[in-house]
C-alpha cells in the first residue's frame, strides 16, 4: 500500500506539471473504485485551473478554487503524468486532460483507491476531520506521543499506526522507526517513557524524510508521478528481513504478527 512517503513522492512528481494549468476534460473509464466516482465530477472540474496540489496524510488534494479533487491511492494505485497519446492500459481508470498536452492518469489494479469531489474544499470531510498531526510538522513530537499514550495497554507499534494519533506511519515505516529507536513493537504504549518517545519521534521523522528523498518504497505496484519506482526498500533494516541478521548486532531478527500486520524486530537491540 502506498504510504505517506509514496503519496508525497507522487505529489512532488505531478504538482509541477499540473499546477497553473486548466483542466480541459476528465474521462472516467471505470467509476467503480472504493467509492463510486461522483457523476458530476467531470463537469465540475472542466474549465477549472489547478491552483495547487497538497497532501493530507495519504490523501492527495488538487485544489480548483471552488472545488477540490481528493485522491487516495488505495492498496495499489498510482498517479502519473503521461502524453495524451499514451495508450491506455488495463487498469487505467481516470484521465485528467490539461492544457499543454498534459494528462494526469490514475491507475489502480485492485480498485481500492478513490477519487472524490469536495465542494467546497474542506478539512471537515469525514475522511479528513479526525486525522492526527502530520509527522513532519511542528505539531508532532515525542511529548505528543507520550501524552496520548498514557494508560494505553495496546502495543506501541499499533499506537504509532493509529491515524488519529499521527498520520501516515504505515507498517513499513513503523517497523523501521521502532528499529531505529530501539523500541520493541510489542511493548505497551503506556509503558514507554517520555525520553524514549522523543527518540521515537525523531526516528519517525528520519525514516519518513529518507524515504521521501529516495522516492518511497516500491514493493509491488507503486511508481511515482514520473512512472519510476522508489528505492527506499533497498535500505530497509527491519521490514521484510525476518530471520536475517540484525544490521547492528547480527542477532537473528524475529518476525511476528501484530494486529494482523507483520512486525520484525531485533530481540537484542529493541526492548
Swiss-Prot record:
GO terms for molecular function: 8-oxo-7,8-dihydroguanine DNA N-glycosylase activity; class I DNA-(apurinic or apyrimidinic site) endonuclease activity; damaged DNA binding; zinc ion binding. Gene3D superfamilies: 1.10.8.50, MutM-like, N-terminal. Signal peptide: none annotated. DNA binds at residues 91, 110, 152. InterPro entries: DNA_glyclase/AP_lyase_DNA-bd, Formamido-pyr_DNA_Glyclase, FPG_cat, MutM-like_N-ter, Ribosomal_uS13-like_H2TH, Znf_DNA_glyclase/AP_lyase, Znf_FPG/IleRS. Its cofactor is Zn(2+). Keywords: DNA damage, DNA repair, DNA-binding, Glycosidase, Hydrolase, Lyase, Metal-binding, Multifunctional enzyme, Zinc, Zinc-finger. It catalyses: Hydrolysis of DNA containing ring-opened 7-methylguanine residues, releasing 2,6-diamino-4-hydroxy-5-(N-methyl)formamidopyrimidine; 2'-deoxyribonucleotide-(2'-deoxyribose 5'-phosphate)-2'-deoxyribonucleotide-DNA = a 3'-end 2'-deoxyribonucleotide-(2,3-dehydro-2,3-deoxyribose 5'-phosphate)-DNA + a 5'-end 5'-phospho-2'-deoxyribonucleoside-DNA + H(+). Its EC number is 3.2.2.23, 4.2.99.18. It holds the Pfam family Fapy_DNA_glyco. Binds 1 zinc ion per subunit. HAMAP family: Fapy_DNA_glycosyl (MF_00103). Monomer. Belongs to the FPG family. This is Formamidopyrimidine-DNA glycosylase.
Amino acid at each position: 500500500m502506498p504510504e505517506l512517503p509514496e503519496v508525497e513522492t507522487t505529489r512532488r512528481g505531478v504538482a509541477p506539471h499540473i499546477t497553473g494549468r486548466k483542466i480541459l476534460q476528465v474521462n472516467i473509464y471505470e467509476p467503480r473504485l472504493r467509492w463510486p466516482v461522483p457523476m458530476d465530477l467531470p463537469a465540475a472540474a472542466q474549465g477549472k485551473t489547478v491552483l495547487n496540489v497538497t497532501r493530507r496524510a495519504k490523501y492527495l488534494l488538487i485544489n480548483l478554487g471552488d472545488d477540490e479533487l481528493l485522491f487516495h491511492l488505495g492498496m495499489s494505485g498510482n498517479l502519473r503524468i503521461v502524453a495524451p497519446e499514451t495508450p491506455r492500459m488495463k487498469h487505467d481508470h481516470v484521465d485528467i486532460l490539461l492544457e499543454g498536452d498534459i494528462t494526469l492518469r490514475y491507475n489502480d489494479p485492485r480498485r481500492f483507491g478513490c477519487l472524490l469531489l469536495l465542494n467546497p474544499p474542506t478539512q471537515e470531510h469525514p475522511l479528513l476531520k479526525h486525522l492526527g498531526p502530520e509527522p513532519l510538522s511542528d505539531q508532532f513530537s515525542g511529548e505528543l506521543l507520550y501524552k496520548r499514550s498514557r494508560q494505553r495497554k495496546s502495543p506501541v507499534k499499533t499506537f504509532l499506526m493509529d491515524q488519529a494519533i499521527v498520520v501516515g506511519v504505515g507498517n513499513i515505516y513503523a517497523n523501521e522507526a521502532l528499529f531505529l529507536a530501539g523500541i520493541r513493537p510489542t511493548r505497551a504504549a503506556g509503558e514507554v517513557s517520555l525520553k524514549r518517545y522523543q527518540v521515537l519521534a525523531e526516528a519517525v521523522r528520519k525514516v519518513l524524510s529518507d524515504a521521501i528523498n529516495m522516492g518511497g518504497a516500491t514493493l509491488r505496484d507503486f511508481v511515482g508521478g514520473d512512472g519510476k519506482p522508489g528505492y527506499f526498500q533497498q535500505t530497509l533494516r527491519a521490514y521484510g528481513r525476518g530471520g536475517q541478521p540484525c544490521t547492528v548486532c547480527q542477532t537473528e531478527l524475529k518476525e511476528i504478527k501484530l494486529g494482523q500486520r507483520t512486525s520484525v524486530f531485533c530481540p537484542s537491540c529493541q526492548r
